[in-house]
Amino acid sequence: MNRRSFLGKTAAGLAASGFLSSFPNSILAMSHKKGINMPLGFQSYVYRDVIGQKPEETMKLLASYGYKNVEWCSPKGYQGPFAPLVKYSGKELKKITNDSGLQTTSCHFTWKEITNDESLAERIEFANQLGLKHMVCSGGLMAKTEDEVKKRCDQMNHVGELVKKGGMIAGYHNHNGEFDEKFSDRPQYDFMLEHIDPSLVKMQFQVAAITSGFKAQDYFRKHPGRFISAHLQDYSPSDHKKEVVMGTGIVNWKDFFAAAKVGGLKYIFVEMESDPSVMQGCAAYIKNI
């Protein structure tokens, strides 16, 4: 998707142009009675082209959809569209978030900024100011050999130890690559689970792995208690590259949330990064699942 197309879809999502009408007010206003016992969150990367320039406006819009929690991307690590937020301290960004009607409990950090002890110490201070519970590494464990993956897992365990001393929990976020790339027909992700110390590092599951043939709920049940959160995506049955409103795609969400309890999930973050216009519909679906 090119930048112009993405911005068009983002603008449509921000303006809720035509989309509000497809969900009756009675549905949108309903509380989450049946209870997924986790706050409804979203990943800020979805709105990367606007949230850096207009953080309050963007977050207030998402709060109006029913979202309660935002997972930030480290401005210093991600730069790019998040660069305008670098000027804020953790305390300042927390105030902006709270004043917009949201909480923040988790943030993504890049491999480069957390695998240097000096940089990590500064990031831990920022995270504590922001009020985080989880510091999630956005990737970096994949490698060409098993030995190199093990070495990187050892690095991640070291990060987890320092984050734990800082009063938080470290997490690791997968992408499809951890499943697509294999050693002896086993996904690299499985190998990572063997070498990551669960007492130091938990996992954040990217549901998009379903498009590579791997279901989050299978991992939740096979590895109970090892997951702290998940990024939620859903895809058209006829086109697995097309993001759709949750509940209209290929993911069995009732089974997902049943298994999430076993997996240990504390937070969920909707992340429809190629089509922000479906974010409101996803909020409505989750509140009424």
Regions found by a protein language model. Give the residues of each.
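Acidic (Asp/Glu)-rich catalytic clusters
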Residues: H32-G35, M59-S64, L85-T104, A121-G131, ...
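Active-site acidic/histidine proton-transfer and metal-coordination neighborhood
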Residues: T10-A16, L20, I96, S100-Q103, ...
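Active-site mouth loops of central-metabolism enzymes
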Residues: G41-Q53, H108-D117
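Glycine-rich, proline-tolerant flexible connector loops at the mouths of alpha/beta enzymes
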Residues: E71-E92
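Histidine-acidic metal/acid-base catalytic patches
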Residues: R4-G41, R48, Q53-K68, F183-V201, ...
